[in-house]
Amino acid sequence: MDQQKVNLLNYNYSQLRELLMAWDEKPFRAQQLFQWIHQVGIRDFAQMTNLGKVLRNKLSQLACIDLPEIVACQKSADGTHKWLLKLECGNCIETVFIPEANRGTLCVSSQVGCALNCSFCSTAKQGFNRNLSTAEIIGQVWLAARELSDNNGAHDKKITNVVMMGMGEPLLNFDNVVSAMSIMMDDLAYGLSKRRVTLSTSGVLPEMERLREVSPVALAVSLHAPTDELRNELVPINKKYPLSQLISLCKRYFKDEPRRKVTFEYVMLKGVNDQPEHASQLIKLLHNVPAKVNLIPFNPFPLTQYQRSSRETIDAFRDKLIKHGINTITRKTRGDDIDAACGQLAGEVKDKTTRSQRWQKLHFMSKTDKSTELTISSEEIA
């Protein structure tokens, strides 16, 4: 990116309006420009024909619309797409699109790597490098929308839902994530409702409180254990924000919207958190919580110590929760043949802690060996 130019993808609508006014332009120009960028998907200011030649020239001199670079794309047998995106700094992140009969869900990353070190998560093994900018977050949506439209026809596959469940802990990149989500929900951009944008967190309580006030999107909590002792091992941030505090906040999170529920994600690990006593503990923990539970079959990755629970064990766990009145489903595993399933996103992170060099090499080789559709550069796609 030209260091003298501002990347307009970093601006939500209100910020873009202020920017144009600072450049002595009429406020209504922000709406036109915003729609060109996000609804039409145009990056070339010369093609924005209703802006006027003087403004187009000014934008060319002062601004740019810079995106991550698509360096690889994989497509699963089930239709799931995974893109490897290279950032300006040289790191890579991953973005996944999951098509279903009546919806298309895009899984978006918020950080390069992750600092929380959850023991069952592939991204955690990469270490942490930095937060993504608003442009790098919303750029994933922009690129996916264009790729799906270009390759499948304008109406074949469409993004109807976004989940902030990719690489990183979204609430540790609060301002940029909230700004990007505001663009996703803006009718002048992608027009998603607040119920169709979901943020997943491991439980960063102060930022959960802030999120509740400023951006009431759907909330998913990475729970994964029914006791502090076990969750301390699986999700180490629990040592700072224990279950009693987390559940207390979840009980009141949607107090003004009693029909909304918090989704609790629970990865099923063989012999670790999947036994009948764990189900009983979870039932007790979620008593009087407006909750629904997603049971997630564990997705293995290189060097992991964990195994996936059997289908029979998962079904028995689910049935016990349902019997006690907890809305529970088992998440269908999608894209695991291309390492796009939950917990498998890894990208390529220049880890400042250098903890992951050996793991990265093994992970890359396993992905290369398994993939039958590891593709091509963005230029070849275009």
Swiss-Prot record:
One of its GO terms (biological process) is rRNA base methylation. One of its GO terms (molecular function) is 4 iron, 4 sulfur cluster binding. Keywords: 4Fe-4S, Cytoplasm, Disulfide bond, Iron, Iron-sulfur, Metal-binding, Methyltransferase, rRNA processing, S-adenosyl-L-methionine, Transferase, tRNA processing. [4Fe-4S] cluster binds at C114, C118, C121. Its EC number is 2.1.1.192. Residues 100-339 form the Radical SAM core domain. Binds 1 [4Fe-4S] cluster. The cluster is coordinated with 3 cysteines and an exchangeable S-adenosyl-L-methionine. Disulfide bonds join C107-C342. It is an enzyme of class 2 (transferase). Belongs to the radical SAM superfamily. RlmN family. HAMAP family: RNA_methyltr_RlmN. Specifically methylates position 2 of adenine 2503 in 23S rRNA and position 2 of adenine 37 in tRNAs. m2A2503 modification seems to play a crucial role in the proofreading step occurring at the peptidyl transferase center and thus would serve to optimize ribosomal fidelity. This is Dual-specificity RNA methyltransferase RlmN. It comes from Legionella pneumophila (strain Corby).
